[in-house]
Amino acid sequence: MHLTLLPQFTLINYSPNQPFTYSQQITIFTAMLKAQSIHKSYGQLHILKGVDLEVAKGEIVTIVGASGAGKSSLLNILGTLDRPDSGQLYIDNQELSKLSNKNLSNFRNVKIGFIFQFHHLLSEFDALENVCIPAFIAGLSRNDSEKKATRLLQMLGLGDRMKHKPNELSGGEQQRVAVARALVNNPALIFADEPSGNLDSTNARELHELFLQLRAEFNQTFVIVTHNEDLAALSDRKVTMKDGLIIQ
């Protein structure tokens, strides 16, 4: 018996003396993110107690659990905003623990997008300029950055709001600008921490549907911390945290 891995990541079982049939194909998924035995303490408080999590490319995973379960601490480590005390983290087939702070920052800016409950848009810049910031940091020219940002804002229904500053936008519009900013470098992975927590039910529903649209159009991978049961129900998989561990 031989095993052959095709470029499409399909595992084929075959015997040289038997004709191949499609029923022998077993599709396997490439891991976009893999966390192994993640531990984190702050002083004497042990927050994460050996968390294991694997997320496939193109998957939408929500993390739920009571306040204090360790959800946001885990998201910060998965998103490389903080380092674990021990454990291994792989994103897009790269192990990150040995990267210097500078290289980790560069990796984060190119490979990862963030969406938070509060949009954190810079008030002195308009929507287009806010979306361009990560592209500028990545070294993209102003012309190319503005082209990418314009396409994203138009796709998100903000083509006529690009020159408006954050205080001239509604809450839902501000969050869509934040989504465009998260996407401008075409990241491999997007992390969201309570992304609809500051929105009314209508804007929250539109944001949740937007995540599905982005996954369909760009094969984006999402890891989302949320208390919103509607958003959790839309995801491909819901994982629950309790006392610093994933319990299901």
Where are these regions (language model features)?
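ABC-family P-loop ATPase nucleotide-binding domain
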Residues: L11-Y14, T21-H39, I247-Q248
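ABC family nucleotide-binding domain
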Residues: L33-M241
